[in-house]
Amino acid sequence: MSGVAAIIAVIHDGKILLTKREDFEVWCLPGGAVEDGESLAEAAIREAKEETGLDVELTRLVGVYSRVGGMWNDMHAVLFAAKPVGGGLTTQPGETIEVAYFSFDKLPEEMLFGHQKRVVDAIHQVSGIAVKQELNMPANDRPSRKELYELRDQSGLSRQEFYLNRISQAEVKEIVEVGGL
């Protein structure tokens, strides 16, 4: 079964806001699952507040990014661009350990797979894109999230090292299905 997520690219003064995930200590755009009774836009605004502490105004629909294959269920992420309109930067215990703005030309290398394309699209004012992101991993190497966290905790590596060694090495094939630069 596929899931749906709302992702937010908060852009302010030539910088983009990223969060560092607690589970693998890599950077990504804020966002998360759409809850029952909630629209995609409402989910984006809620997730921005929960994960960053900011109140945001959505300014543009960047696109839809469909992650297929990989370890868990397929996920369709809808990316909105936004601007901050209130609040203050904070982390969300259990989900984020750091929140920071990055200059467009100084993005962190340690990013969650697939988010590089999303960040670049948001920065370049892309609108209306549909991207299929295929994560190719061996069929026998698809542990559940719980099993993956256990492997991480038993590995002797830092959370980031585990992610970079095990997950980020998977091949990601990105296919622009609609729109683009």
State where each predicted segment sits:
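Active-site-adjacent beta-strand/loop module that shapes the phosphate/pyrophosphate-binding cleft
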Residues: 66-88, 116-127
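Conserved N-terminal beta-strand and adjoining loop/helix that marks the start
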Residues: 1-16
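A structural signal for short, well-ordered beta-strand segments
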Residues: 8, 61, 80-82
